């Protein structure tokens, strides 16, 4: 780092990777270890090893890095823990897909150990690239503590957690309804289910009454259903207890079509009496709502499907407790055997029609559950699974949020959390796949369950001799189970480690709203169950939950691989050609039929690929877009704007260094031997006001606002105004003035670099290494420098008032130049009329600044009422600003020029307006095109109004 030179051209590619290596080599990311200082810890949500990081990861990780760098510069003992997640189903499916594409083999061509070996190889490759991406993003994580959810220590923690929960009777094995993926042959979580709306039908079927004892002309009930194939598993028909149409039928029986099974008519408040006919067929083994009703009424459950989604030859009947029974007649005609759901439906409707049991069919809007992993329709299936009794864990978790021990940001997500926590069902934690934590359970030949650390441990504990054959549970644990232990297991639990004592509870978790229940709530529940404070009370996993919105593409669509609109952060940092971008987006697609659509959209959005922007521009963009839980529409134009912002900071720093390096900056000289100009005092005041607001906004996690205030200060106050205001002194000042301005330039730049470092770490480190040689700072890295603090003693409000007045005067003069089409190179004569003594003094004292910035020839004062010929008059506070019109100015020519320009703009407005008034265009054009046309119309209308105003001003001259 000794060769730091601020080159003329800002090229992020040349500086970012060397700087990161410098940070790593210096071990600056690790906790400093001084436990007398306050600790601060963030546990990064571990990315899945299913591929690479996308913009959503970059967004959340940038927010985390801003916080950790900020707290590190505050002197806190900081730990940012990183790691990766094994992502059970998703990873196994991905590797199976890759194997099939490369060899034509499926999982069934491998032993379990062989497939697992392939997945570990993929894990190594994927984790390596994810680590590379994190480093390119500038993440200041403690790499020495990088974890994986299936490493040895984490696996031990998972086993320990399972055993402890089982021994407290909080884990059990039972037969319940789950989301079943017939292709993957496993249960999946609700998060892995996508509900899609589609057009379908609703069938109205006659259910004949059996020996009706009621007085009625009807011999049947009409039942409406969208899934007639599940009629084979009906065990009741339910009506609402207050539905007067069916009140007398409650307690009677009907004969189920096809099976001729005698089933009861029951009443239940869950029935919607206004939906269909008000009669609901109950199939507890294949519908979640029916399952709840069935449990409530003690109904038997009939499983009609095999695990691959085909009709069974012999249906399985279970009592309401999930035990096999033969209490119902369950033989069905052979014509239905081994049919899949669609064909079974067609066959059953055909049979009902032949038996004159089909009343009618109506079109109906349906919501069909699909597997996010395979795209197949999810089948509610009755299977043996492992469960956690979560209701026994919820109260502490609810109280922690209710009492604001844990705070949600934004607050509205607190209500979402409560709505889930108050309606919990037992959590299915087993999966029928090979990749994951093996459930530490064994069975003997009598299906007795033994839970322990290993078979040897179980035999010793239960005094089992070698004649007792034990079989290991084949299922693995749900990925969310191990993830829910993340905050404490990654710090060494179940051992009582120093890291656990120092850094737990952690300070903040940053996550998306879609996993508040699947991850956040479960982390809170399990952490508060396992981890206790010194006084024995339950310990929380984190103090704050910061919820981010989703990053959507510029059309507002969710970014996903299937849509082909995911953007790799590295492609934004380094750039990518259109050819390579297309290859990346269409490689290893699970749905290759979408490739043409993806190619067309990509070429339309990025015809020339993506230009390199560097990490700092990406980070600043992400922070600027971080607006309190709202979804983010990615904007390449804003990215380009913030790349320009970094470039402006770079060149402003070069300007400062050119005028301060090897110059007398008065760094070690008494303040009395320096003369600070009005501009110096003003910029110091504005800087400290910015620092004050920065701290306040970061405390409430308004990242978008801290980006905005930094952009405003650096671009407009520091670069546009202060650097210009210093030039008269830098070029014509005396020794004291020069010393004061140079001192302000270099010390303010150094402070400004520290203020912006958490957001744009690379460019600030690069410049700071050069700046520190001027300021005499002996520090090794800006990362460990103190973060700027607000200092009220340097606030000079008079300087703010004076400079704001000067700025307004300059802007008024510049506006006049535009209105009169006078080149900036032509010096102007200006006159102030009716000026107070205070303002006159302000102008006189700062006439050099005014003349320099506004390009003035002279400034004069005249009294109220004095006529000043051939001038343009503009009000400026309580006085009047008169600008002498140059002899070269031709009023008529200028009016004609403005009119011609106005006519041209008007034709453009008419063309666009005609297009927007065309219904065919509105109905057929993409929304993005319509939006662009409307924006262009607004722009031209704004220009037109300005031209009209300028023309009016000209006529008055």
Swiss-Prot record:
<dbReference type="Pfam" id="PF08264">
    <property type="entry name" value="Anticodon_1"/>
</dbReference>
<dbReference type="InterPro" id="IPR033705">
    <property type="entry name" value="Anticodon_Ia_Val"/>
</dbReference>
<dbReference type="InterPro" id="IPR002300">
    <property type="entry name" value="aa-tRNA-synth_Ia"/>
</dbReference>
<comment type="function">
    <text>Catalyzes the attachment of valine to tRNA(Val). As ValRS can inadvertently accommodate and process structurally similar amino acids such as threonine, to avoid such errors, it has a 'posttransfer' editing activity that hydrolyzes mischarged Thr-tRNA(Val) in a tRNA-dependent manner.</text>
</comment>
<dbReference type="InterPro" id="IPR014729">
    <property type="entry name" value="Rossmann-like_a/b/a_fold"/>
</dbReference>
<comment type="subunit">
    <text>Monomer.</text>
</comment>
<dbReference type="GO" id="GO:0005829">
    <property type="term" value="C:cytosol"/>
</dbReference>
<keyword id="KW-0067">ATP-binding</keyword>
<dbReference type="GO" id="GO:0004832">
    <property type="term" value="F:valine-tRNA ligase activity"/>
</dbReference>
<protein>
    <recommendedName>
        <fullName>Valine--tRNA ligase</fullName>
        <ecNumber>6.1.1.9</ecNumber>
    </recommendedName>
</protein>
<keyword id="KW-0648">Protein biosynthesis</keyword>
<dbReference type="InterPro" id="IPR037118">
    <property type="entry name" value="Val-tRNA_synth_C_sf"/>
</dbReference>
<dbReference type="InterPro" id="IPR002303">
    <property type="entry name" value="Valyl-tRNA_ligase"/>
</dbReference>
<dbReference type="InterPro" id="IPR009008">
    <property type="entry name" value="Val/Leu/Ile-tRNA-synth_edit"/>
</dbReference>
<dbReference type="InterPro" id="IPR009080">
    <property type="entry name" value="tRNAsynth_Ia_anticodon-bd"/>
</dbReference>
<comment type="similarity">
    <text>Belongs to the class-I aminoacyl-tRNA synthetase family. ValS type 1 subfamily.</text>
</comment>
<keyword id="KW-0436">Ligase</keyword>
<dbReference type="GO" id="GO:0002161">
    <property type="term" value="F:aminoacyl-tRNA deacylase activity"/>
</dbReference>
<feature type="short sequence motif" description="'HIGH' region">
    <location>
        <begin position="47"/>
        <end position="57"/>
    </location>
</feature>
<dbReference type="InterPro" id="IPR010978">
    <property type="entry name" value="tRNA-bd_arm"/>
</dbReference>
<keyword id="KW-0030">Aminoacyl-tRNA synthetase</keyword>
<feature type="short sequence motif" description="'KMSKS' region">
    <location>
        <begin position="558"/>
        <end position="562"/>
    </location>
</feature>
<keyword id="KW-0963">Cytoplasm</keyword>
<dbReference type="InterPro" id="IPR013155">
    <property type="entry name" value="M/V/L/I-tRNA-synth_anticd-bd"/>
</dbReference>
<dbReference type="GO" id="GO:0005524">
    <property type="term" value="F:ATP binding"/>
</dbReference>
<dbReference type="InterPro" id="IPR001412">
    <property type="entry name" value="aa-tRNA-synth_I_CS"/>
</dbReference>
<feature type="coiled-coil region">
    <location>
        <begin position="889"/>
        <end position="918"/>
    </location>
</feature>
<keyword id="KW-0547">Nucleotide-binding</keyword>
<dbReference type="Pfam" id="PF00133">
    <property type="entry name" value="tRNA-synt_1"/>
</dbReference>
<dbReference type="GO" id="GO:0006438">
    <property type="term" value="P:valyl-tRNA aminoacylation"/>
</dbReference>
<keyword id="KW-0175">Coiled coil</keyword>
<feature type="binding site">
    <location>
        <position position="561"/>
    </location>
    <ligand>
        <name>ATP</name>
    </ligand>
</feature>
């Amino acid at each position: 780092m000794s060769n730091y030179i601020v080159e003329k051209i800002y090229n992020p590619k040349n500086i970012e990777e060397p700087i990161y290596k410098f940070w790593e080599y210096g071990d600056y990311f690790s906790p400093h270890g001084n436990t007398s200082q306050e600790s601060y810890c963030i546990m990064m949500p571990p990315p899945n090893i299913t591929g690479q990081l996308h913009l959503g990861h970059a967004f959340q990780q940038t927010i985390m890095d801003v916080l950790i760098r900020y707290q590190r510069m505050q002197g806190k003992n900081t730990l940012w823990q990183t790691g990766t997640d094994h992502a059970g189903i998703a990873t196994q499916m991905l590797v199976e897909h890759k194997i099939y594409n490369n060899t034509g083999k499926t999982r069934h061509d491998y032993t379990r150990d062989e497939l697992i070996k392939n997945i570990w190889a993929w894990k190594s490759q994927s984790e390596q690239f994810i680590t590379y991406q994190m480093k390119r993003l500038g993440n200041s994580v403690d790499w020495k503590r990088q974890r994986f959810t299936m490493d040895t220590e984490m696996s031990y923690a998972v086993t320990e957690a399972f055993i402890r929960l089982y021994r407290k009777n909080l884990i059990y094995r039972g037969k319940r309804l789950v989301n079943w993926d017939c292709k993957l042959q496993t249960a999946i979580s609700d998060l892995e289910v996508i509900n899609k709306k589609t057009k379908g039908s609703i069938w109205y079927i006659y259910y004949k009454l059996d020996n009706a004892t009621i007085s009625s002309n009807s011999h049947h009930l009409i039942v409406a259903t969208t899934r007639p194939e599940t009629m084979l598993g009906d065990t009741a028909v339910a009506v609402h207890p207050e539905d007067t149409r069916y009140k007398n039928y409650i307690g009677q029986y009907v004969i189920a079509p096809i099976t001729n099974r005698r089933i009861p008519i029951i009443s239940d408040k869950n029935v919607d009496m206004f939906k269909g006919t008000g009669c609901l067929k109950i199939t507890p083994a294949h519908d979640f709502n029916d399952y709840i009703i069935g449990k409530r009424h003690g109904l038997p459950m009939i499983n009609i499907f095999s695990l691959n989604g085909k009709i069974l030859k012999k249906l399985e009947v279970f009592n309401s407790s999930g035990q096999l029974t033969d209490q119902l007649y369950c033989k069905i005609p052979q014509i239905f055997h081994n049919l899949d759901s669609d064909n079974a439906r067609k066959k059953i409707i055909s049979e009902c029609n032949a038996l004159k049991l089909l009343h009618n069919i109506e079109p109906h809007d349906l919501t069909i559950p699909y597997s996010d992993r395979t795209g197949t329709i999810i089948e509610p299936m009755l299977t043996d699974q492992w469960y956690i009794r979560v209701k026994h864990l919820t109260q502490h978790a609810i109280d922690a949020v209710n009492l604001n021990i844990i705070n949600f940001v934004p607050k509205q997500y607190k209500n979402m959390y409560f709505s889930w926590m108050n309606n919990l069902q037992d959590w299915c934690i087993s999966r029928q796949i090979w990749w994951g934590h093996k459930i530490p359970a064994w069975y003997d030949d009598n299906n007795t369950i033994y839970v322990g650390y290993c078979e040897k441990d179980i035999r010793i504990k239960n005094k089992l001799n070698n004649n007792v054959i034990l079989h290991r549970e084949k299922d693995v644990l749900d990925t969310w189970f191990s993830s829910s232990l993340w905050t404490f297991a990654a710090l060494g639990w179940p051992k009582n480690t120093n890291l656990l004592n120092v850094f737990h509870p952690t300070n903040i978790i940053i996550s998306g709203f879609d996993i508040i229940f699947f991850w956040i709530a479960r982390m809170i529940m399990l952490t508060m169950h396992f981890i206790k404070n010194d006084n024995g009370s339950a310990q929380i996993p984190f103090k704050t939950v910061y919820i981010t919105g989703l990053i959507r593409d510029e059309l507002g669509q969710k970014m996903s691989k299937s849509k082909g609109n995911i953007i790799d952060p590295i492609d934004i940092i380094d750039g990518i050609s259109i050819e390579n971008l297309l290859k990346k987006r269409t490689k290893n697609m699970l749905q290759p039929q979408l490739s043409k659509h993806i190619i067309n959209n990509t070429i339309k959005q990025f015809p020339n690929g993506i230009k390199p922007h560097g990490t700092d521009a990406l980070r600043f963009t992400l922070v600027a877009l971080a607006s309190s839980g709202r979804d983010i529409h990615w904007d390449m134009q804003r990215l380009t704007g913030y790349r320009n912002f970094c470039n402006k900071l770079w060149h402003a720093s070069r300007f400062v260094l050119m005028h301060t390096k090897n110059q007398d900056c008065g760094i070690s000289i008494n303040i009395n031997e320096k003369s600070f100009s009005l501009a110096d005092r003003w910029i110091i005041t504005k800087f400290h006001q910015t620092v004050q607001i920065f701290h306040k906004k970061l405390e409430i996690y308004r990242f978008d606002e801290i980006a905005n205030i930094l952009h405003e200060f650096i671009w407009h106050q520091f670069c546009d105004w202060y650097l210009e205001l210093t030039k008269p002194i830098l070029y014509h000042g005396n020794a004291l003035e020069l010393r004061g301005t140079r001192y302000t330039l270099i010390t303010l730049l150094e402070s400004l670099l520290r203020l912006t470092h958490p957001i744009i770490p690379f460019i600030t480190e690069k410049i700071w290494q050069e700046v520190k040689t001027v300021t005499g700072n002996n520090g090794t890295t800006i990362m460990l420098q103190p973060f700027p603090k607000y200092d009220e003693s340097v606030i000079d409000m008079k300087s703010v008032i004076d400079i704001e007045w000067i700025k307004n005067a300059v802007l008024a003069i510049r506006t006049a130049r535009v209105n009169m089409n006078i080149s900036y190179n032509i010096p102007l004569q200006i006159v102030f009329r009716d000026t107070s003594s205070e303002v006159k003094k302000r102008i006189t004292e700062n006439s050099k600044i005014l003349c320099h910035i506004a390009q003035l020839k002279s400034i004069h004062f005249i009294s109220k009422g004095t006529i000043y010929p051939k001038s343009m008059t503009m009000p400026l506070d309580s006085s009047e600003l008169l600008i002498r019109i140059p002899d070269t100015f031709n009023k008529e020519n200028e009016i004609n020029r403005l009119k011609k320009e106005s006519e041209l703009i008007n034709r453009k407005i008419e063309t666009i307006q005609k297009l927007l008034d065309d219904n065919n265009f509105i109905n057929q054009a993409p929304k993005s095109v319509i939006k662009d046309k409307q924006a262009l119309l607004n722009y031209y209308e704004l220009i037109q109004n300005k031209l009209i105003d300028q023309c009016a001003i000209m006529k008055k001259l």
